[in-house]
Amino acid sequence: MGSDVIGVLGADMRQRRMDSLKISNWILAGLATALSLTAGAGAQTGTTPQAQAPQTPAAAPATAAPQKPAAPLQLQNMGQTPPKADPFPQANPKYFTATTPTVDTVNAFLKALWGYDPNRIWRVEAIQTTPAPNISKVVVFVSDKTPGSKVQPTAFFVTPDEKHAVAGDAIVPFGATPFADLRKTLQARADGAARGATGKDLLLVEFSDLQCPHCKEAQGTMDNLVKDFPNARVVYQSFPIVDLHPFAFKAAAYGYCVQKQKNDAFFVYSAAVFETQDALTTETGDETLKNAVTKAGLDPAAVDACAATPATKDQVNASIKLAQDVGVEQTPMLAVNGHLLPLTGIPYETLKTIVSYQASLDGVSTGATGPAVGSSSVPPTLGK
């Protein structure tokens, strides 16, 4: 994407490096993948290539007054120790031909995504106009503080309203507080069975499918989050993917009817369904769901009748619509105050760090013991 800027760094710098998270394809994951941006703690290291400055594309003449780049090296706000040497080329004003977004906004956006990692460093090297009216191209160089770490170039586009960033086939929220709108949406509309706190200041919403094998695997993670974050409200939100899982919608409908009678019974029901997930077949699926209802202490016949009503089907469809509206494309997915993260592939300690960091950005307490993540001051920048 953008050979005029990235091509000059050479094939070695374009080589993708696997991040320790190994996240798949949305927001943090999607952006990291789409932007070829996978530097992080524990990432592969090697000789740092000679980074070169971006080249202004001929198709994007400088029609606006260049921005003045911010401090040359931006570090994460959790890090206390700056790198021994500045691995990036100095930002050149001639590559800042677009008036929006500002360098400060881009840095705030990237800190929202990556600030949980104290080892990651970057510099915004260009914010350029493009042939598409009011669509800007942002170029960032990223690395980490491990000696000899490679510099990764990446680029993404920002929409005219500065609400979204586009990278490859990923469209993600953009801005200084990119997850704020999704957080408000989920606070208003996430109505699944819930555990933990009654308040929604720290809201963890799990989008899940009862017939999804990866969702079954994620339940231990969700149980741990409930224990480790006492101030979090943890919501199970149904997102049955019926094209892949024929019994998922009916299982979700049963789940809604169980929740309607008794919130806590839902989690007994869902655990029983996950435990017998392989039996959700044409021959044994109905009996499997009824047995799960019985384990939850409710009447299977009453739940079955409730699940068949148009009102219940509308409720499940509304939950699906919510998932689609906030950009969920796979299960299991976790929204941490609006920040969408795939639940599989993230080490639990890393996930805990991200939850704590997002809470610190939003100014809310997690209730967890130990030092607050993201509470340290921003370390000094280099190269002034």
Show which residues each predicted segment covers.
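C-terminal cap of thioredoxin/glutaredoxin-like
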Residues: 45-75, 95-99, 107-109, 113-167, ...
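Acidic/histidine-rich, surface-exposed loop or edge segments in extracytoplasmic proteins
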Residues: 82-94, 251-252
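A short, surface-exposed interaction/processing loop segment used at functional sites
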Residues: 159-193
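A generic structural signal for alpha->beta connector loops
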Residues: 121, 201, 231-233
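Structural alpha/beta surface segment adjacent to cysteine/selenocysteine redox centers
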Residues: 205-294, 324-329, 357, 361, ...
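Stable alpha-helical elements in mature extracytoplasmic
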Residues: 102, 106, 200, 218-221, ...
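Sec-dependent N-terminal signal peptides
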Residues: 9, 14-44
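A short beta-strand-turn-helix
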Residues: 185-202, 226
